[in-house]
Amino acid sequence: MLNEQDYKLLAAKGITEQQLNQQLADLRAGFPFLELSAAASLDNGGIYAPTPEVRKAYLRAWQDYVADVDHKVVKFVPASGAASRMFKDLFTFLDGTSETPDTDFMKSFFEHLPQAAFLHDLDQKLQELHGKTSEQLVAEGDYKSVVAALLGTRGLNYGHLPKALLKFHRYEGDTSRTPFEEHLVEGALYAKNAEGKVQLHFTVSPEHRSLFETLSATASQQLGAQYQAQYDISFSEQKSSTDTIAANADGTPFRNADGSLLFRPGGHGALIENLNDIDADIIFVKTVDNVSPDRLKEDTVTNKQLLAGLLVSLQAQAFAYLEELEEGNVSEERMQEILHFLEKDLHCQSDTAHGLEGLELLDYLYTRLNRPIRVCGMVRNVGEPGGGPFMVYNADGSISLQILESSQIDMNDPAKKRLFEEGTHFNPVDLVCGVRDFNGEKFHLPDFVDPSTGFISHKSKDGKELLALELPGLWNGAMSDWNTVFVEVPLSTFNPVKTVNDLFRPQHQV
C-alpha cells in the first residue's frame, strides 16, 4: 500500500506507519458519540459560582502565588487562525455583480466603517492607490475599491493575515491595538510575577511568524514601559508530526495529483504538543479573538485571577493529599475524606470507588489526584455557537466533567439532543491549567488525551471528495483525562470577533 516516496514523506513529517494505519482505521470506523450523564449546571453542582467572600479568598490566593518568583506562569494563545472567515461577506460582495452594498451586512459595514480601528491605515493605503479616502470613494459610489484595499495583497491584506495581527481597537490619539497587543496587556494585568516578568507564548503559522516577531519587538517595548512589564514572548508552530492523513470515501489514503499522500493539519488538538513543550507551573489558555478594550478589561482580569486562585488552592490541597498517599500510612477515615474532595471539589464520581478499601482505595485516589488540573470559565448560554460543559461517562463507568462539541453528541437520540439544547452554559475557551505534579515534575500531557474523541469532516481537493481527520480538540478530548472544574464567569468576559462587523459592537468600541 505504501511506496518508497510515502515512507520518505512519513519520515520527514515524523509520523510512524503505525500512526498512519491508526488514522486510516479511525477514518473508516468513525468515532463513538460520548455517553452523557447531564449538562453541567449550577443546579447540579457541575458548575461552581463562588460567593463574594470565597471569591476574595481565591483572588488573594492568586496574588500570593504570583508574588513567589519561583512560580512560572505563562499565557498561551493559539494565534495561527486566518482572518479570512471574518471577511466572508466582504469577499462575496467583491466577487459579486452588485457595485453597491445590497445586503444588511454590507450596509452595516459601510455605515460603521468610520469607527474601525483600521480606518487610518486603510485611508493611507487608499490615498496611495487612488489618491482618495474611504469617505470620498464611498461618496462616489466606489465601494469595491475600499473593500479591495482592505482585503487584497495590494492593500492591507486583511483577507489573508491571521486575526491576531488585525487592528481591533482604536484608542485616543489615533493609536490602535491588535489582538496580539491586547493579549500582552492582559498578561501584564494578571500573569505578571513579583519581578515584573510576563511570559506569553503564541502558536503561529510559519508564513506569518516573521510578522509576529516584528510586532512583538515593538509592542513589547512600548507596552512594557506602559505597564511596568518585562515581556518574554515566544512562538511555536504546529508540528508536522501532528498532521493527519486524508482518505477517500472507501477509507484508502487520498493521493494528490502527483501521487503523494495528502496530509492536513490536525486542528487545534495538535497544540497539546506545543502546550506540553512549555516550561511552566500554571498556563492560561484563551482564544486569540476574545479580547476587550481597556475600559472593559476589569471583569476579564478579575475572573482570570479568580480561576487561577481556585486552581492553585485546589492544587495545594491535592498535593498535600498526594504526599500523604505516597507515604502510604493513611487511615480509612482519611481516605474517605480524600474521596470526598475528589468527588465534590474535582467532580470525579465513581460508584465502584465506594466499594474499595485499603490499598485498592489508596491506589485509586493516588491515580485520580495525580493528574493535570484545569479550571474553566463557563458563561451563560445566549445562543452563541460552540461547545458546552457536560457530565460524561468514562469507559470505566465513572463520571467526569468534559467540554463537548455538538458533533460528539448523538443528536438523533431525543434525550441527548434535549440535554444539549437545555444546557445553561457554554464554553468561551477560558482555561487555567496546572501542568506539574506534586513533586514539581511536568506531566507528559499527551498521556492524558482520549484518542477516541477525534472528529471527521467531509472536504474536497482538486474537485475530489475526501475525509479529513481532526485530532481530539485541545480543550475537548485532548484534556479528557485531566481533573476539571467549571466556574461561572460573566458574559462580559466573552467578546469574540467572528465577523468584521463584530468589531462595531459596543464591546469593541473604546
Model-derived regions: residue spans:
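Long, compositionally biased intrinsically disordered regions
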Residues: 2-42, 192, 217, 356, ...
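Domain-scale recognition of functional cores that engage charged ligands
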Residues: 10, 14, 39-382, 386, ...
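Intrinsically disordered, low-complexity boundary segments flanking structured domains
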Residues: 219-224, 391, 412-421, 469-476
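C-terminal, active-site-flanking charged/polar segments
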Residues: 283, 393-428, 437, 453-458
